[in-house]
């Protein structure tokens, strides 16, 4: 079964779609959390497994956990659920992989960080500051013709924030990609 994230009537052309009963279904967005031993080559093997099966990794985030010698890898991608389930089973068999989770829907809480350098002069600073306040962004550097702003949130919040700042001129941008944890008392 293919889950839809967007439906479009037949007659419109879209890339990477699956046709089913006169509608196009976009592949579902997946957030995969992988707990691993922090060893040489683990990340390369995991990324290779995804790319070898035709998945394009949209975001990739790696960092140590609170346990010594362990790291969490968070991967976001779009893809067919059946093919991804097979890939996850193969991931789970890799030697240094401790556990793999595919967060579907509201099972996980995800956030990303963005640093954005925006063109700002004396006439636009107040408006940019108001946008920052609405999105709970933080101005972390002020220069004569620019501001560097930090913001965190889910992917949709970050997109909306960047859309508003785009009219001022974004000169540089760095995003972390999603990091995610499972909701509730169960841990990965």
Question: What do the PLM-derived regions correspond to, one by one?
Answer:
Residues 13-27:
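Short, Lys/Arg-enriched N-terminal segments with co-localized hydrophobic residues
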Residues 28-72, 76-188:
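Long, contiguous binding/interaction regions
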Residues 1, 27-28:
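Initiator methionine at the very start of the polypeptide chain
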């Amino acid at each position: 079964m293919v889950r839809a994230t967007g439906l479009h009537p037949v007659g419109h052309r879209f890339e990477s779609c699956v046709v089913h009963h006169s509608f196009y279904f976009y592949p579902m967005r997946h957030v995969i959390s992988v707990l691993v031993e922090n060893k040489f080559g683990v990340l390369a093997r995991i990324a290779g497994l995804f790319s070898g099966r035709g998945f394009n990794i949209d975001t990739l985030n790696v960092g140590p956990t609170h346990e010594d010698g362990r790291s969490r890898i968070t991967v976001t991608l779009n893809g067919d659920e059946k093919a991804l389930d097979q890939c996850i089973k193969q991931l789970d068999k890799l030697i240094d992989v401790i556990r793999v989770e595919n967060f579907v829907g509201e099972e996980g809480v995800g956030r990303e960080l963005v640093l954005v350098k925006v063109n700002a002069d004396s006439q636009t600073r107040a408006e940019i500051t108001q946008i920052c306040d609405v999105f709970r962004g933080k101005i972390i550097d002020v220069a004569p013709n620019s501001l560097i702003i930090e913001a965190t949130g889910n992917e949709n919040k970050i997109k909306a924030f960047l859309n508003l700042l785009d009219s001022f001129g974004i000169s540089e941008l760095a995003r972390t990609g999603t990091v995610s944890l499972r909701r509730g008392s169960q841990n990965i």
